[in-house]
């Protein structure tokens, strides 16, 4: 493709309000950060519990480097496991109430590796239409038949299962647990009933449930009390855990199979000891206390209450993920720009991350935010919302 084609496509994205600008971060993650040289209130991070700059995690990461060096330097199946990797897998399995867990380099890799290891040609995947990009890509790589059902629509899903299930050897029902752009929650109890009834693998990506839902942030399976009924629970270490990495939790046989077949595990180096040690410390903190999880929910509920009073449409959010619905892509980009001028860092989310005409500001609340921070955020959102005609003056 000629360079002129690259330029044409980039110009089209700018004209349509779809061009993404990556800001420069000059500080650790926290309630306030330095962005492009400016101190701003951070409403863009997945750092739900403040672990990304937690002193205990930083000390643990340093110890990991001291004990095992900067990196593993090889694939686990070739050069072997460093002992902390196995220890973290055991801790994650216990935390999730599963028999075993398998560690990946990221949550994205976890889906890319796990889905094709479980289903393939001649099988079917029943997938929520708003599932994360990593699920979509993992499904495509599997070469299984992908059958999409309307978002959260269990009735239509069952109709599709009645029509299609008998045509395939294996079938999987796959869903996000918490949907990252809307903050709503999958009806896992009903999906578990359908998986039992139609003999399907039940697979959930709990990236935004860990550290948020369930007892001490154990996630969506714990939240619904479905231990033993969900076959695969995908997790990430890059959101509430504040580090980087991913994992799949489930039965011992699942873990054994993934270590034989999951390509990101077989063909890419393992996570670093620094990441592993920090992740273990995050699990320990959550096992010790649910104080940070409670603070997260207090902050989220306070912010939503005052944003709704100001007249904003927050969609159907059931979690700290707070979409501020705007619709028009260009207006949404302008909204983000004006907030930044007012020292608030909240990113515009538009196509292809969400459907065209569904652009929104996505606000991520953290346990590290103070009440003053939240009041400041509502004040600035209200001022910009009135200026741009998103809410009434």
Curated annotation (Swiss-Prot):
Pathway: Cofactor biosynthesis; biotin biosynthesis. Catalyzes the decarboxylative condensation of pimeloyl-[acyl-carrier protein] and L-alanine to produce 8-amino-7-oxononanoate (AON), [acyl-carrier protein], and carbon dioxide. GO terms for biological process: biotin biosynthetic process. This is 8-amino-7-oxononanoate synthase. NCBIfam families: bioF, gly_Cac_T_rel, PRK06939.1. Substrate binds at residues 132, 353. The modification N6-(pyridoxal phosphate)lysine is found at residue 239. It holds the Pfam family Aminotran_1_2. Keywords: Acyltransferase, Biotin biosynthesis, Pyridoxal phosphate, Transferase. Its cofactor is pyridoxal 5'-phosphate. Pyridoxal 5'-phosphate binds at residues 107-108, 180, 205-208, 236-239. It comes from Coprothermobacter proteolyticus (strain ATCC 35245 / DSM 5265 / OCM 4 / BT). It catalyses: 6-carboxyhexanoyl-[ACP] + L-alanine + H(+) = (8S)-8-amino-7-oxononanoate + holo-[ACP] + CO2. It is an enzyme of class 2 (transferase). Homodimer. One of its GO terms (molecular function) is glycine C-acetyltransferase activity. Its EC number is 2.3.1.47. Belongs to the class-II pyridoxal-phosphate-dependent aminotransferase family. BioF subfamily. SUPFAM superfamilies: PLP-dependent transferases (SSF53383).
């Amino acid at each position: 493709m000629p360079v002129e084609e690259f330029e044409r496509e980039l110009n089209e994205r700018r004209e349509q309000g779809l061009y993404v600008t990556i800001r420069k971060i000059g500080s650790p993650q926290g309630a306030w950060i330095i962005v492009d040289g400016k101190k701003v209130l951070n409403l863009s991070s997945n750092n739900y519990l403040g672990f990304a700059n937690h002193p205990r995690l930083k000390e643990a990461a340093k110890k990991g480097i001291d004990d095992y060096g900067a990196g593993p330097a090889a694939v686990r199946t070739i050069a072997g496991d460093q002992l902390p990797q196995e220890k973290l897998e055991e801790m994650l399995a216990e935390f999730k109430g599963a028999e075993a867990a398998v560690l990946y380099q990221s949550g994205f890799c976890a889906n890319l590796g796990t889905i094709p290891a479980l289903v393939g040609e001649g099988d079917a995947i029943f997938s929520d239409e708003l599932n994360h990009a990593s699920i979509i890509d993992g499904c495509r790589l599997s070469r299984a038949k992908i059958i999409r059902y309307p978002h959260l629509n269990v009735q239509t899903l069952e109709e599709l299962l009645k029509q299609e299930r008998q045509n395939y050897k294996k079938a999987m029902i796959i869903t996000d647990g918490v949907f990252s752009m809307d903050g709503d929650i999958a009806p896992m109890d009903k999906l578990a009933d359908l998986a039992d009834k139609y003999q399907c693998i039940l697979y959930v990506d709990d990236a935004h449930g860990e550290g948020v839902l369930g007892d001490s942030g154990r996630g969506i399976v714990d939240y619904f009390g479905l231990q033993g009924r969900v076959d695969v629970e995908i997790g990430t270490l890059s959101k509430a855990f504040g580090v980087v990495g991913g994992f799949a939790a489930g039965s011992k046989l699942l873990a054994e199979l993934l270590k034989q077949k999951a390509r990101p595990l077989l063909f890419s180096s393992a996570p670093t000891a620094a990441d592993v040690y920090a992740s273990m410390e995050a699990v320990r903190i959550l096992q010790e206390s649910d104080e940070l999880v409670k603070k997260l929910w207090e902050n989220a509920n306070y912010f939503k209450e005052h944003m709704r009073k100001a007249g904003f449409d927050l969609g159907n959010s059931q979690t700290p993920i707070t979409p501020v619905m705007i619709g028009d892509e260009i207006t949404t980009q302008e909204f983000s720009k004006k907030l930044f001028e007012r020292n608030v860092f909240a990113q515009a989310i538009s196509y292809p991350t969400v459907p065209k005409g569904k652009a929104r500001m996505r606000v991520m609340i953290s346990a590290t935010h103070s009440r003053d921070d939240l009041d400041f955020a509502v004040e600035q959102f209200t001022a910009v919302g009135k200026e741009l005609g998103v809410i009434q003056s």
